[in-house]
Design a protein with these regions (language model features):
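Short, Lys/Arg-enriched N-terminal segments with co-localized hydrophobic residues
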Residues: 1-8
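Beta-strand-rich recognition/accessory modules
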Residues: 11-44, 51, 61, 131-136, ...
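Extended, loop-rich substrate-binding clefts of extracytoplasmic carbohydrate-active enzymes
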Residues: 25, 30, 99-154
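Acidic-aromatic substrate-binding/catalytic surfaces of carbohydrate-active enzymes
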Residues: 41-100
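Short, hydrophobic/aromatic beta-strand segments
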Residues: 49, 57-59, 169-175, 312
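Beta-strand/loop-rich accessory regions of lumenal/periplasmic or secreted enzymes
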Residues: 78-105, 192-201, 205, 213-214, ...
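Asparagine-centered strand-capping/turn motif at beta-strand->loop junctions
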Residues: 161-167, 304
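Active-site/ligand-binding surface loops and adjacent short beta/alpha elements
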Residues: 170-172, 176-253
């Protein structure tokens, strides 16, 4: 079953539609913000707030939540949701003149372009779209069309971006899918696949290092950009492992605020810094460039078996 409308839809129409699109339901979530719930025939689910095109939940068929969202997160216009998968565009972090991580993650102008489901055993998709406006052009003077596709399967979640340059000048930007992976205790987690890579350590002013560990562990604050990272990484912890497969995004960011700074973070609950590790696919080390009329496509897939827990190696 498929729904598509080129002009996008506003909340009243979406609520009226929700009973007719089968496995994508649109409703009102926290903070009275519109939210889409994707349900796969296997029982897997995902939750996407239209505010920021923000994935806030992913549960494969085993029903276990794989993403972390803070209990103190703010759900309000102009605010970023703390956790899930924020879309950082057209700037990563403070690497430029725009607000931290750009405007996409706090925009309320995302529109539902289409929903679809392929029947038993297939996939459930939600496509959102954000275009330039007077507000975006005031801070980033470019014409663009950004599509974000969320695809749910029984044991995986894909998030894909397509950026079309709708203007007459080249676009340059940095970006990331700022994924907060849930972990029972960050100190017991390990990321596999980073050995041998060069990285920038932003806890030391961007100092350059080479990763020597086969399994990277986090004991406190970590803020690293791994350059030219492989497309397949794995998070191992006291639970089912999660694999991240990225597409057309060169870098990987590893981030946790650490206990010392967490106390000053108003939208992070007490002790919650120990319950996540950000493993982010991105174009961070150097800007991407899209010529007029061209389209850039990239994305990632998170997958997790529903087998017995894995333990860090």
């Amino acid at each position: 079953q498929t729904f598509s409308r080129g002009g996008g839809m506003h909340l009243a129409a979406l609520l009226a539609l929700s009973a007719n699109v089968g496995q994508v339901q649109i409703g009102t979530g926290r903070g009275e913000l519109p939210v889409a719930t994707l349900t796969h025939p296997s029982g897997a689910t995902a939750e996407v707030y239209l505010h920021g095109a923000h994935v806030t939940s992913w549960r494969p068929a085993d029903g276990v939540e794989r993403l972390f969202v803070s209990s103190a997160s703010r759900y309000a216009a102009g605010k970023a949701i703390r956790g899930g998968i924020p879309v950082c565009f057209p700037q990563f972090s403070g690497r430029g003149p725009l607000p931290n991580h750009g405007f996409a993650r706090t925009s309320s102008d995302w529109q539902v372009e289409s929903t679809s489901s392929d029947g038993p055993g297939g996939e459930v998709c939600l496509v959102l779209r954000l275009s330039d406006s007077a507000e975006t052009r005031a801070v980033w003077p470019h014409a663009f069309e950004l599509r974000y596709t969320v695809t749910l399967r029984d044991a995986s979640l894909s998030t894909d971006v397509q950026l079309r340059n709708a203007g007459g000048e080249p676009l340059e930007f940095t970006a990331a899918l700022h994924t907060y992976l849930a972990t029972p205790q960050v100190g017991t987690a390990a990321v596999v696949g980073l050995a041998g890579l060069s990285y920038e350590d932003n806890t030391e002013g961007g100092a350059a290092y080479t990763e020597l560990a086969e399994a990277v562990r986090v004991r406190g604050e970590v803020d690293r950009v791994y350059l030219d990272a492989p497309d397949l990484l794995q998070l191992r912890h006291e639970g089912p492992a999660v694999e991240l497969t990225k597409r057309n995004l060169r870098d990987v960011v590893l981030w946790n605020i650490g206990g010392e700074k967490a106390a000053a973070m108003a939208d992070l609950g007490a002790g919650e810094w120990q319950r996540y590790l950000c493993l982010e696919s991105g174009a961070v080390g150097s800007a991407l460039r899209v010529l007029p009329g061209e389209t850039f496509a990239a994305g990632q897939t998170l997958s997790s078996s529903c087998a017995a827990p894995t333990h860090p190696g």
